[in-house]
Amino acid sequence: MTESVRAFVDGRVGRLVLSRPAALNALDREMIRALTASLQIWQHVPEIHAVVIEGEGRAFCAGGDIRAIRDAAVAGDSAAIEAFFGEEYALNRVIAEYAKPYVALVDGICMGGGIGVCVHGRFRVATEAAMFAMPETGIALFPDVGATYFLPRLPGALGMFLGLTGTRLAGADAVHAGLATHFVPKAKLQALSAAIATDGVASLAEFAEASPPFTLAAELPAINRCFSAGSLAEILQRLTQEGAWGEKILATLRAMSPSSVLWSFGIVHRGAARDLPACLTAELRLTRHVTRHPDFVEGVRAMVIDKDRIPKWSPSAIEEVDARAIAEMLE
């Protein structure tokens, strides 16, 4: 077992602790393999009634090891990229199909690949310190780890909004949105974790509290009006009719990789008609294209490595993107 994942049995549960705090518990291939192996073993241990996963430090999991993926892209190592995403998406499916209760305790940053090892589980507990986001369009990827399945199934057009804009949700907001199932105050989280080990997942009902009001509630009508559109062009047009809020969201979208916003819209839109395995297959296929696109290397440089946050996208505007090329990538 890798030092970055601690796996052990505690009472009636198998515990998984993501233990790479200096990297905000970002998932590398070794961690993905360790998580998968533990889940597969514990599936067949009768004494283990549930699995609990949490993160060490201030993050649950900040996503995949995007630096390593960029390095592979720069080196032209498509086999390493394929292996990483293939194994990550296989883990997402293992979690989604897991026969035993799977409980994610989210008490910090949960983004991208972190949502992938959280949202597919049966129970997702969020505290007031939790922060959920799918920020992939900002680095010229797309909402993956099964997001093309779960985003279209969130209320109204909220999923498309979250997937394209990368908007961050606090813990209570994640419950309202459907990404989390229970809100538990941070002060009670360790007691809940201990109770699950002795009394099982029934403890969730005892510790969960009513979520504070949804901070996006006032924006939901506009989100639904705009992001329910059948094309990205129509979303952009509708946003021009929404005053200051629409201007803000337009500016957000136009700051993202133009190509990424287009292919992200396309694959999330298609995900509404696919089951999870089909979504994961389509996502893996799309990674082969987007990691060869110059925007991916540039986006990770600007947002993750150099952190100047001034990416030079190519092309630089949504209207300049070859829509036919994007459509071919999505086939």
Give the ranges of each region predicted by the language model:
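Hydrophobic/aromatic residues within transmembrane alpha-helices
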Residues: 16, 53, 65, 117-118, ...
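Gly/Pro- and small hydrophobic-enriched strand-loop and loop-to-helix capping segments
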Residues: 121-144, 178-192
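Conserved CoA-thioester-binding segment of acyl-CoA-metabolizing enzymes
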Residues: 1-54, 93
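Glycine- (often His-adjacent) and acidic-residue-rich active-site loop
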Residues: 55-90, 140, 317
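Loop-centered beta-sheet repeat module
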Residues: 152-198
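Amphipathic alpha-helical blocks and their helix-capping loop/short-beta junctions
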Residues: 179-256
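Long, low-complexity C-terminal extensions of enzymes
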Residues: 239-244, 253, 257-331
